[in-house]
């Protein structure tokens, strides 16, 4: 195989959707046991940049990696230089505080992640057949960029187990955190699910569903072109309201939804 070279991009404008998605979501991935992930597609990540949800003034500065074997792109990674720890949903504020109390500068740091999306998935995006070479090259590039730019650290969040193992072999520390996931235990229907709950919880859920079913309006499902700018304007108001509660932050701009 040709030597693998890795370069960093300041924007996804510098790589075509086809080249990126050949690594992020190649055809046949589902059959290969690698499910498609909408959050690592060029379209999603580029929408974050295009809308100003990431980029100048946000603390998320794109530094995406592209690995090539000869002229062929074999791996990519969504990478950002971060000026804070917000929007990651992994909390390292104590690390930052300890680092700075020891006289260091924690920010900026490198973050391999999907912004604002605490959903586990691949982060070291490789073409089928290039998993080992691609992961190794991307991890080495992250370490090299951190060292060359005197950054405090490099992080990969919500990655897969095999990526975590590859990171450990490359010298990364493996940190385990906690999430709560709902698992479908082969429930036949909603009543079957309710039957698995305690009496008190069943009563609460049924009361909430009755309230939703009798709110005095209609619920209509819209997809694709049926969703108009007026719908997105209304959604945006709800998004802002929800994000403002309980110390939340609505990170996405209105333009992201266009």
Residue ranges: model-predicted function:
Residues 106-118:
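Short glycine/proline-enriched loop/turn "hinge" motifs that connect secondary-structure elements
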Residues 2-101, 105, 143-147, 152-258:
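A conserved beta-strand-loop-helix scaffold within acyl/acetyltransferase catalytic domains
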Residues 10, 114, 132:
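Short, charged/polar micro-motifs that form catalytic or ligand-binding hotspots
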Residues 106, 131-144:
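Conserved acetyl-CoA-binding loop-helix of GNAT-fold acetyltransferases
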């Amino acid at each position: 195989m040709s030597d693998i070279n890795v370069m960093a991009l300041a924007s996804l404008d510098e790589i075509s959707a086809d080249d990126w998605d050949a690594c992020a979501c190649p055809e046949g991935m589902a059959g290969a046991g690698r499910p498609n992930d909408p959050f690592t597609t060029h379209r999603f990540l580029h929408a974050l940049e295009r809308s100003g949800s990431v980029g100048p003034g946000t603390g998320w500065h794109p530094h995406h990696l592209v690995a090539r074997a000869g002229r062929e792109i074999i791996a990519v990674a969504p990478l950002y230089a971060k000026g804070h720890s917000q929007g990651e949903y992994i909390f390292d504020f104590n690390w930052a505080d300890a680092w700075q109390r020891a006289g260091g500068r924690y920010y900026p740091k490198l973050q391999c992640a999907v912004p604002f999306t605490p959903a586990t998935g691949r982060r070291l995006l490789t073409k089928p057949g290039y998993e080992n070479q691609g992961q190794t090259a991307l991890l080495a590039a992250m370490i090299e960029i951190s060292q060359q730019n005197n950054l405090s650290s490099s992080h990969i969040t919500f990655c897969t187990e095999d990526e975590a193992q590859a990171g450990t072999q490359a010298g990364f520390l493996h940190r385990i955190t906690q999430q709560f996931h709902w698992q479908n235990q082969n429930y036949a229907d909603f009543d079957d699910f309710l039957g698995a709950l305690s009496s008190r919880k069943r009563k609460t859920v049924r009361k909430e569903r009755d309230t939703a079913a009798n709110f005095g309006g209609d619920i209509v499902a819209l997809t694709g072109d049926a969703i108009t700018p007026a719908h997105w304007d209304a959604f945006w108001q709800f998004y802002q309201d929800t994000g403002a509660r309980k110390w939340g932050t609505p990170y996405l701009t209105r333009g992201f939804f266009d």
